[in-house]
């Protein structure tokens, strides 16, 4: 079990769910990515989150452009939805405590 600071608490209906994040995905979309293209990107992220949740994994938004996830495959899937020429995406492996 991870330390308390490394465990993210997620509120879902009346049930408390705890996850241990393994990967941190940070993205910085260019201002060139606008309107309908942004909407498509966020819809893809929601679809990835839903698919992961159905398999017992969770992806959490921590800040506007920061996501925590439990699997490498989820992190790579998230990174692949962004237009790489106009978005800077970084994936970090969580090895210690995360404090926000």
Model-predicted regions and their roles:
Residues 30-53:
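Short amphipathic alpha-helix segments
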Residues 1-5, 40-45, 65-68:
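Short linear motifs at secondary-structure transitions and domain/linker junctions
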Residues 2-3, 96-100:
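Short acidic DE-rich linear segments
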Residues 49-91, 98-100:
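Short, intrinsically disordered low-complexity segments
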Residues 15-33:
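Short glycine-/aliphatic-rich beta-strand segments at the starts of folded cytosolic domains
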Residues 1-20:
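N-terminal, charge-rich interaction modules
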């Amino acid at each position: 079990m991870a330390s308390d600071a490394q465990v993210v608490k997620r509120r879902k209906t009346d049930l408390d769910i705890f996850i241990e994040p393994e990967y941190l995905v940070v993205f910085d979309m260019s201002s060139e990515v606008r309107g309908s293209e942004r909407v498509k990107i966020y819809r893809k992220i929601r679809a990835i989150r839903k698919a992961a949740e159905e398999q017992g994994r969770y992806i959490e938004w921590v800040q506007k452009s920061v996501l925590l996830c439990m699997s490498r495959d989820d992190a790579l899937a998230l990174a692949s939805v962004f237009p790489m020429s106009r978005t800077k995406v970084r994936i970090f492996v969580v090895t210690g405590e995360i404090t926000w």
